Amino acid sequence: MKIFSLAGAGLAAGAAALAGLAAAAALHRHPLPSALLIRGVFSSANRLQVKRIQPRIPGFTVTRHRGLRYLGTGGKPSLDLFLPATDRKPLPVVMWIHGGAWISGSKEDVAPYLEVLAGYGYAVVGVGYSISPEAVYPTAVKELNAALAFVREHADRYGLDPNRIVLAGDSAGAQLAAQLALAVTNPEYARDTGVVPAAAPGQLRGILLNCGVFDFDAVARMAGPVGWGLRKALWSYTGSKNWKATPAAGHMSIPEHADHRFPPTYICGGNGDNLTLTQSIPLADRLQELGVPVVRQFWPEDYKPALGHEFQFQLHRPEAMDSLLRTVAFLEDVTGVSALPRRPLEKVIALEEDLLAELPAIEEKLAA
């Protein structure tokens, strides 16, 4: 799910165009055409996102272990592991799940950001997983649980601390991370969903949720191109046009199942993202009502310039830098491990004149 400015301008511009195609009969008969159209919009936005961020990452020394097959030699999904240059072992683990409305995206889309996070002294895992319509619910959830098992089983080999794990995700990845956290911390939920959690509750120290989708009753009522796009994606992901009536939709709804056992949470969303008012803020409120420690980061509705979906990856923006530094502070708090000292990133990453010159072309490409 992306309403984006970068990933932000993508859905806002792209979903409006896609909504116009919704009148085509093919889009009503089968989820595949809609899913592939939405996937195309997201893929274009994600490529531009990586292009903009990667050259502007400070030179942290990070060891990269790419393409680790967590399902064994026969399993296609893989994960990437980014390790900081430090003798301090074992390292707390951040397991990041990428977004893409359950129908698009890849771990490569968030890799530059994860390298920055690893530079602060944490082992950061970017997990790839099967997307729909090729794979439907609950394939992704079970794969992500297997990835969690892989991290624990290979902790000694890579110098990881299996007792200090933080789940994380953006957009649909935030929903998947929250669902996995429910399975780890709530045995009744795990039993109902058929997930045998790969970690004990005490090993999960916290969760990072950026711009997620959590309440599917709200999605069913959501107006405009964003609501249209999400409902088409859920048709594809659940395998049913009547997705709201499926067991999958019930399992995926986080507020319905969360209780006081849910892990400490950092939750963030931009004021220009439709999902903030309908999803992130209500979940933050609900978790606090339940007594869960919550760090909230939101902006006033009239804040300018508006912060779109997944603005956190736009490291040229001071608000994204603030989000990153608050993320690191949250990791320090929940893991009990101090971050490595770094030069303030705002001194290293700037919005150069050449990037400003690129913006009109980027926006035109996204709109097309």
What kind of feature is each model-predicted range?
Residues 3-368:
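Alpha/beta-hydrolase superfamily serine-hydrolase fold, recognizing
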